[in-house]
C-alpha cells in the first residue's frame, strides 16, 4: 500500500497579501476553498489536495518557512529585512511577486522642520516597527536617532510627543494626511516576495517547482502590466 505524500504548505498572512495571492494561485489552477476572513480555521484546504494554506501573522511567515513548518510562503520585503537581522542564515527568495506594493518612508508632523533638524545635527526620536531598516537608513545618512519600537498606531507617536518622526509603510499617504503628518523621505519600495524552505526545495522539488514556475509567470505578468 502506498502512502500519500503530505500536502505542500504555503504560509500566508490575512489581508492584502492574501487577496493579491489568489490570482497567482489561479495561474496554477488552484482555488482557495475558504477565506480566512470568514473562517476561524488557520489551516485552509485548496482545490488541489497537494497544497494547503496556513494563516499566520505577517511577521511570522519567515519563521514558519525557515524552520520547515511551511514549505514556502509570501512575505513583504519589510518583514524579510527585519527577520534577517539576527538570523544566521538567509531564506531563499527566488521571486519578487510584484504584489502588495507600497513604500517604507519617514514621516513627521506637518509643522516639524525635518530638514532643519537633520541639517543642525539634532538627535531625533523615531518610532517604528522596522528597527533594522530605520537604523540602516539613518546611519547611511549620518543622522543621529533614538529608535523607539512600536507595533501599531504609528501615526500617534509624533502627535503626542513620543517621537519626532516615524518610519512606516505608506501606500496612498491618506492615513498620514488624516493625522496631520507628511512624508519627508522614502527609504525603499516594498513588494512581497516568495520565500522557500531550502530543504523542501531539495526533497520535494518535483511537487514544488511547478508551483514556483506558475508564480514566476504570474509575477512577470504583474510586472508587465505595471510597466
UniProtKB/Swiss-Prot annotation:
Which GO MF terms are attached to this record? ATP binding; ATP phosphoribosyltransferase activity
Extract one GO cellular component term from the record. cytoplasm
Chief subcellular location: cytoplasm
* GO terms (BP aspect): L-histidine biosynthetic process
Question: Any keyword Iron?
Answer: no
Q: How does it assemble?
A: Heteromultimer composed of HisG and HisZ subunits.
Instruction: Give the NCBIfam families listed for this entry.
Output: hisG
Instruction: Spell out the HAMAP family in the cross-references.
Output: HisG_Short
Would you tell me the protein name for this molecule? ATP phosphoribosyltransferase
Amino acid at each position: 500500500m502506498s502512502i500519500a505524500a503530505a500536502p505542500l504548505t504555503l504560509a500566508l498572512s490575512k489581508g492584502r497579501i492574501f487577496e493579491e495571492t489568489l490570482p497567482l494561485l489561479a495561474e496554477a489552477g488552484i482555488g482557495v476553498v475558504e477565506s480566512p476572513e470568514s473562517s476561524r480555521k488557520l489551516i485552509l484546504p485548496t482545490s488541489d489536495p497537494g497544497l494547503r494554506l496556513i494563516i499566520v501573522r505577517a511577521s511570522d511567515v519567515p519563521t514558519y518557512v525557515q524552520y520547515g513548518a511551511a514549505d514556502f510562503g509570501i512575505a513583504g520585503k519589510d518583514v524579510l529585512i527585519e527577520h534577517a537581522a539576527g538570523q544566521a542564515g538567509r531564506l531563499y527568495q527566488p521571486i519578487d511577486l510584484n504584489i502588495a506594493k507600497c513604500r517604507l518612508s519617514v514621516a513627521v508632523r506637518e509643522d516639524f522642520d525635518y530638514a532643519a533638524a537633520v541639517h543642525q545635527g539634532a538627535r531625533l526620536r523615531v518610532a517604528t516597527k522596522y528597527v533594522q531598516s530605520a537604523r540602516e537608513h539613518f546611519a547611511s545618512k549620518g543622522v543621529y536617532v533614538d529608535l523607539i519600537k512600536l507595533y501599531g498606531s504609528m501615526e500617534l507617536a509624533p502627535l503626542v510627543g513620543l517621537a519626532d518622526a516615524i518610519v512606516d509603510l505608506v501606500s496612498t499617504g491618506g492615513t498620514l494626511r488624516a493625522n496631520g503628518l507628511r512624508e519627508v523621505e522614502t527609504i525603499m519600495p516594498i513588494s512581497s516576495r516568495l520565500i522557500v524552505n531550502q530543504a523542501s526545495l531539495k526533497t520535494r522539488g518535483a511537487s514544488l517547482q511547478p508551483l514556483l514556475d506558475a508564480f514566476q509567470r504570474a509575477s512577470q505578468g504583474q510586472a508587465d502590466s505595471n510597466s
